[in-house]
Amino acid sequence: MNRLYPHPIIAREGWPIIGGGLALSLLVSMCCGWWSLPFWVFTVFALQFFRDPAREIPQNPEAVLSPVDGRIVVVERARDPYRDVDALKISIFMNVFNVHSQKSPADCTVTKVVYNKGKFVNADLDKASTENERNAVLATTASGREITFVQVAGLVARRILCYTQAGAKLSRGERYGFIRFGSRVDMYLPVDAQAQVAIGDKVNGVSTVLARLPLTAPQIESEPESEPALQTAPVETAANPSAEQRQIEAVAAKIQAAVQDVLKD
């Protein structure tokens, strides 16, 4: 079984629900005929909700992939609250008709997993990022860049499932979590990442490139060393007369003495 898609076609999280719906639908059909229609509708809905199709995975090492299906609701410069650094934030909102299986956006090593309890407001709202129940995965890419991807519960989705932990290595496109019935995923990338999507765009999990992240961080240019200040010659004042000035004063004194001698004669 493919390691990147260990639960082909239908996510394992839906097996009990789909199995129960199918059994109940068959039972009601045998007993009540057309009265079983609502149960069949529910079973079909569960089948489409828990679908988990395999997708082509772009292998460009600079490509950061969308971890889920959905619609882009945020593309902005923001503060990564888990690392306390400036970041490029990209948020994806999932409605009940999207695939809700979450997959790794890059080849990376998980460094930390942070779970926060919270509310269950509409995941389409910006405040859901800070107020709702959420689970953040902090990771370092194969090239050493730090990224953060956050599972955010929604108004209906009240169960975040995360199957990874600190120290785990994830391949791009590898399944790591699931959120049931509508939710949101926030991505925090280094500020030099270049967004490839805009607000309102629809994205497909692991097949859509959200951003391009250079393999190396930009070099911070060091400030040039300041040149030593030029030494200026001391300003000559009356207290420090020049040789020329002393000669002039000496000649003037001789002339004055000669004039006085003439006057005495």
From Swiss-Prot:
EC class? lyase
Q: Membrane topology for this entry? A: Peripheral membrane protein
Q: Where is the protein found, in the record's own terms?
A: Cell membrane
> Keyword Transmembrane: yes or no?
no
Its Enzyme Commission number? 4.1.1.65
Q: Name one GO molecular function term.
A: phosphatidylserine decarboxylase activity
Q: Which residues form a coiled coil?
A: none
Pathway-wise, it operates in: Phospholipid metabolism; phosphatidylethanolamine biosynthesis; phosphatidylethanolamine from CDP-diacylglycerol: step 2/2
**Superkingdom of origin:** Bacteria
Q: What is known about its processing and modification? A: Is synthesized initially as an inactive proenzyme. Formation of the active enzyme involves a self-maturation process in which the active site pyruvoyl group is generated from an internal serine residue via an autocatalytic post-translational modification. Two non-identical subunits are generated from the proenzyme in this reaction, and the pyruvate is formed at the N-terminus of the alpha chain, which is derived from the carboxyl end of the proenzyme.
Q: Tell me which GO cellular component terms the UniProt record holds.
A: plasma membrane
Residues recorded as bearing Pyruvic acid (Ser) in the entry: 183
What does the record give as cofactor? pyruvate
Q: Region Disordered: what ranges?
A: 218-242
* Cofactor binding annotation: Binds 1 pyruvoyl group covalently per subunit.
The GO annotation for biological process reads: phosphatidylethanolamine biosynthetic process
The UniProt keywords, alphabetically, are:
Cell membrane, Decarboxylase, Lipid biosynthesis, Lipid metabolism, Lyase, Membrane, Phospholipid biosynthesis, Phospholipid metabolism, Pyruvate, Zymogen
Q: Which residues does this entry assign to the site Cleavage (non-hydrolytic)?
A: 182-183
Main function? Catalyzes the formation of phosphatidylethanolamine (PtdEtn) from phosphatidylserine (PtdSer).
Concerning its family, UniProt says: Belongs to the phosphatidylserine decarboxylase family. PSD-A subfamily.
Name of protein: Phosphatidylserine decarboxylase proenzyme
The gene is psd
